[in-house]
């Protein structure tokens, strides 16, 4: 989904023909399952065929999944695909900018997946519980997928999102952050009060 021709960062850097092994997923741009491995020579292909655990324990794509991938690839290579990538990157940059303006910590480089740092697992879970109340939806990622104490949301941006959609989710996240943080402080205070009460007996 990245770059003018949709060939990703490796295509943008002009390295596609120089890479010995290229691996890609069908779960994002292609909205399917599985992925691919492309190699330069038959020796690498044979090695991966026999010694790559992901290949050994996988199955072939179904015909329906393969047809979906091919249909998506046709769009990627078309003028429609180019226009959608431009809209997508515009939305990515707009979301990152609006999140930052709202005082939220955005991680990583611009891509269709926008991570927003929450901090502790406790706060992350409370904010995740609050977010749908305010009209937002995001994937919570926490330890062990990320370092302990560094939980985050992963927002997935689409070309079809409008700036109004993005404004709404930024507003929802800011409200959920306030509510979740207040709830975490309240739980912490209650715990301290209970501890003091037990100590007094």
Regions found by a protein language model. Give the residues of each.
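Short acidic, glycine/serine/threonine-rich loops at helix termini
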Residues: 1-7, 34-37, 151
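PLP-dependent enzyme catalytic core of the Aspartate aminotransferase-like
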Residues: 133-134, 145-201
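Active-site pre-lysine segment of PLP-dependent enzymes
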Residues: 1-21
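Active-site PLP attachment segment
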Residues: 14-47
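A short glycine-threonine-serine/GTX helix/turn-capping micro-motif
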Residues: 52-61, 79
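Short hydrophobic/aromatic beta-strand micro-patches
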Residues: 38, 115-117, 156-158
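Short, ordered loop/turn segments at secondary-structure junctions
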Residues: 42, 62, 143-145
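Conserved PLP-dependent catalytic core of the aminotransferase class-I/II
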Residues: 63-110, 114-137
